[in-house]
Amino acid sequence: MHAQCSGTSGEPVSPPLIAITCGEPAGIGPELCLRLPERFGAKAPFRLLVLGDRGLLAERARHLGLAVTLRDWTPENPFPSLLADTLDVLHFPLTAPAMPGRLDPANAHHVLNLLGRAVNGCMSGEFAAMVT
C-alpha cells in the first residue's frame, strides 16, 4: 500500500522524506535509528531515510536482537510504502571500524559526509527535513 497525504489541491502526494543521520558511529545514534521502525512504522505520516553505514547498522541490530530489515535506498528508486519492520538506508561506508563507546578520529569524515549529504538533500528539495 502506498502511503499518501493530501495536497492543497486535494490530489494525493507522497509523504515527506526525512533524512536521519546516524551520527558518530561509536555513539548511540545507530541504535536509535534501528528503533525507528518499531516506533513509527507504517503509521507515520512521513517516510524515514537513515544515512549511515549499512554494515554497522546490521551489526548493531544483531547485537541488540532487533529484527529490522535494512533496505538500500537510492534517489532513482525511492520506496513508496512504509513498513513496520524495515529501515531504508542510504549507505555511507565507515572510514574505520567502529566500536561502541570508543571514538575514532578516522571516522570524522564519515560523520561530516552524512551531514553534508543530508544538508544538500534538504537544500535541493529531495528531503523535507533532516534529523541529526
Predicted segments with their positions:
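Contiguous, glycine/small-aliphatic-enriched amphipathic segments in soluble metabolic enzymes
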Residues: 2-132
